[in-house]
Amino acid sequence: MIFWRAIAAAALLTVTPALLAGEIPPEARRSGYSFMGSETRAMQDDDTSNPGMLFVLDGEALWGRKTGGADKSCADCHGDARTSMKGVAARYPAFDKPLSRPVTLDQRINLCRADHQQAAPLPYESRDLLALSAFVAHQSRGVAITAGDAPELKPFVAQGRDLFMQREGQLNLACANCHDDNFDKRLAGAPITQAQPTGYPLYRLEWQTLGSLERRLRSCVTGVRAQAFDYGSPELVALELYLMSRARGLPMETPAVRP
């Protein structure tokens, strides 16, 4: 599948001028939801049909479960997530003062596990980490994204933007080639969106499971036949931060559904 998408991407860019449109102005930015077909939108809108909600329910159970050497649950510190976590995911990645760098929501969950629960970190893309992340992010559904506002984040946002604009891989393509210049077209039968990460972690029909934004970014990098960054790498965190800051003002949708 990745091979054929790479071929399709190369074909698309041979007939379409690259990097002519420039960055999408804020007033023209749209969630990927608006590019979806009616069946996909209906699946996302109905919580009883949205498969991502199964992960949210798992995350709710994990929220109240004591773990680690401290024998503490998330709820012991944060109480009712419906109030304490409302708006939190809309701010992430956020700046961590002790680390002097931004951290993603997944990384924050693992930092909390280490610092307050004395528990081992959950592996990236593990069901438990995705479930907790989905549960926390779900509390912000409908809340406008505000990520990237802190002054300390400015150089990291700039780093993410540079990565988004940078050509790479054997196909010599940048993220911007597809998502700034060619959105609203199709690639290998799927709609090209603006890459506004409003609903992560989201349920991707191709994956048949929930996945993080980092998984999606790694897939795109592999698609242009470049070496994917490691999960949790500074590059992926910077890209996620830039994309979330670029989506400021759009409402959170977690768990979104995409093809």
Model-derived segments and spans:
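Short Cys/His-rich "knuckle" micro-motifs
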Residues: 84-87, 185-189
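N-terminal, post-signal-peptide region of Sec/Tat-exported proteins
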Residues: 45-76
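Conserved short C-terminal alpha-helix that flanks the catalytic cleft of nucleotide-sugar-dependent
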Residues: 63, 163-164
